[in-house]
């Protein structure tokens, strides 16, 4: 009856243990999103604990919520009360959703490929030779790196939101500004 709560707890405990005990698995699991799953599970457990949502009774629906492929690696972290009902409700194909989804995906690709990926080599070089940089170069590094981070994560999020939107699923925006 409460299997999803136990599953979420196990995911959160495994993620926390791996984070604290750094193992060889770090090279495999964390890049595959274990930290994301840990936060997702903690979010779910918190909502259930504070009774902001009821515990999901169907463990298959819960696993679909936890493993929803559009937010698999990059988020956004969704509240169970927002995403679970959408995943349970069959949705017909709607052309306008597909177009809107493709626009989000295109925007995400622009952010990721044309902004983040172009800035990244520059900031990498600067960070590897930080002691040899002039004041202007340090200032440029401080200005460019947040732009790179924003474009990278925001781009991935836009791609995930767009892909989900094409299926009629509305994910929460991570970056409103």
Q: Which role fits each region the language model picked out?
A:
Residues 1-177:
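Membrane-embedded transmembrane alpha-helical bundles that form the catalytic cores
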